A protein has these predicted regions:
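Arg/Lys-rich, positively charged N-terminal/basic patches that mediate binding to nucleic acids
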Residues: 1-30
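A short, surface-exposed loop/turn module that caps and links secondary-structure elements
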Residues: 33-58
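Residues that form or immediately flank small-molecule/cofactor binding pockets and catalytic motifs
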Residues: 8, 53, 83
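Enriched for short, Lys/Arg-rich terminal
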Residues: 14-24, 59-88
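Nucleotide phosphate-binding site architecture
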Residues: 10, 49, 88
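Residue-level signal for alpha-helical context at structural boundaries
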Residues: 27-31, 45-49, 66, 70
Length: 88
């Protein structure tokens, strides 16, 4: 699975994850798993509804989610990352 980042995602990553070493390590561990199997039960990947219809989400931690979009069978675009209340 090829993973690309939306420009806005890069800014959010730098702001919320980059300087938190524990969350940063967890993020990259989860991203490795996601790139191998985006529907691993550990990720709790799910389709979104309502105003976010067409997008998907998976969990980094209990409260931290990544919002993404499937571009095709082999590519995804990361859109947002943050707490449940921030991204939904």
């Amino acid at each position: 699975m090829k993973v690309t980042w939306e420009q806005g995602f890069k800014r959010i990553y730098k702001k919320k994850i980059k300087n938190n070493q524990e969350l940063k390590k967890r993020f990259w561990d989860v991203m490795e798993l996601f790139s191998k199997n985006p529907f691993s039960p550990r990720l709790r990947t799910h389709k979104l509804t309502g105003r976010l219809e067409g997008l998907w989400a998976f969990s980094i931690t209990y409260d931290c989610r990544v919002i993404f979009k499937f571009l095709d069978d082999d590519r995804v675009l990361l859109i947002d990352v943050g707490g449940h209340e921030e991204v939904y």
